[in-house]
């Protein structure tokens, strides 16, 4: 049996990292995973050795060496193609489970709605990079731009996070639209962390029980 692929999406500060940590402790004990399956946690960009170099280039390079928007898009597509080829697909083929902090939705939200690049172009490039792979579950942690800025106020910002409120509003609007169009599971990320975690666990349980029973 092939493994399952779960993705968490949302603007910066929505709590993805915290919730992925909670899920990674819960899932192996949940009864959903086969006993012989392993759980792998990864992220985009940066889920592979090559991806780590691309992450530094995309998010942490000096301001005098900033890639053009189209270059940025192509680098994210390259990161995803390598990520799927080297890590995600091999693990799924073995029956293991994978949780990723960001996937295709982030590219649409940040490069499409945030940067203003052509959405159809992004979808075509993403389809090439994904080679047919689609997550069984994508969970969108929805928070306001003000909450995002408040939560990140005392943290050092990467290049994308430092784009400012106007950019973030476009990205947040993009995420909401994509979540609706793609039928993601939307969870209110403004709640207490424990409540968010409980809702995620319930959503995963319901979704995978239905998926497993139909396959």
Curated annotation (Swiss-Prot):
Family matches, as CDD domains: TMPK (cd01672)
GO MF terms held by the record: ATP binding; dTMP kinase activity
Entry keywords, A to Z: ATP-binding, Kinase, Nucleotide biosynthesis, Nucleotide-binding, Transferase
Reactions that this protein is recorded to catalyse: dTMP + ATP = dTDP + ADP
Gene Ontology CC: cytosol
GO BP of this protein: dTDP biosynthetic process; dTTP biosynthetic process; dUDP biosynthetic process
Pfam families assigned to the protein according to its UniProt record, in alphabetical order: Thymidylate_kin (PF02223)
HAMAP family with a match to the protein in the record: Thymidylate_kinase
PANTHER family: THYMIDYLATE KINASE, UMP-CMP KINASE 2, MITOCHONDRIAL
Protein purpose: Phosphorylation of dTMP to form dTDP in both de novo and salvage pathways of dTTP synthesis.
Family membership: Belongs to the thymidylate kinase family.
Protein name listed in UniProt: Thymidylate kinase
Protein's organism: Prochlorococcus marinus (strain MIT 9211)
Organism ancestry: Bacteria, Bacillati, Cyanobacteriota, Cyanophyceae, Synechococcales
